[in-house]
Curated annotation (Swiss-Prot):
Gene3D superfamilies: Mannose-Binding Protein A, subunit A
Organism: Fowlpox virus (strain NVSL)
Matching InterPro entries: C-type_lectin-like/link_sf, CTDL_fold
Superkingdom field: Viruses
Name of the protein in question: Putative protein FPV235
């Protein structure tokens, strides 16, 4: 009888600890969510990749596609996120009317303009926030 009571007591303690851990993880679950990923900045419910190298417009769009984020999204130029003196290739929803077929949109000091697409500039990739549950990923990965 003593062994059964001891076993029941250990199971009760283990269950209580497990329940406590589940509650803590649920309360602090945002800690286990990756929102944008490495090398991306989160701002205003979007993820931004701001390049450190220069490419042509076509090459920069290809890199953005390969990174999993196109950048055909309205960019808020008043956000202050890119308050800089660098030129960045961007592709925006309401594209500026670049009359020449070889002209592409870029952002300079929070102003959108047109320039020759083959010139190399820094670039910005934009994607929506994509939450990844690291705990679930780890569990799946270890199976």
């Amino acid at each position: 009888m003593c062994k059964k009571a001891r076993k029941r007591g250990l199971l009760t303690i283990a269950f209580t600890i497990l329940l406590f851990v589940i509650i803590l993880v649920d309360i602090d679950r945002d800690r286990y969510l990756v929102r944008c990923g490495k090398d991306w900045l989160e701002f205003d419910n979007l993820c931004y990749f701001i390049s450190e190298n220069k490419l042509s417009w076509d090459d920069s769009m290809m890199v953005c596609d390969n990174l999993g984020g196109g950048n055909n999204i309205n960019i808020n130029t008043n956000s202050g996120l890119l308050n800089t003196s660098k030129d960045y290739w961007i592709k925006i929803v309401d594209e500026l009317d670049c009359t020449n077929i070889n002209m592409c949109n870029f952002l300079y000091s929070n102003i959108v303009g047109c320039d020759i697409c083959t010139i190399e500039k820094f670039y910005i990739c934009i994607k929506p926030i994509n939450k990844i549950n690291l705990f679930s990923y780890f569990v799946e990965y270890t199976k």
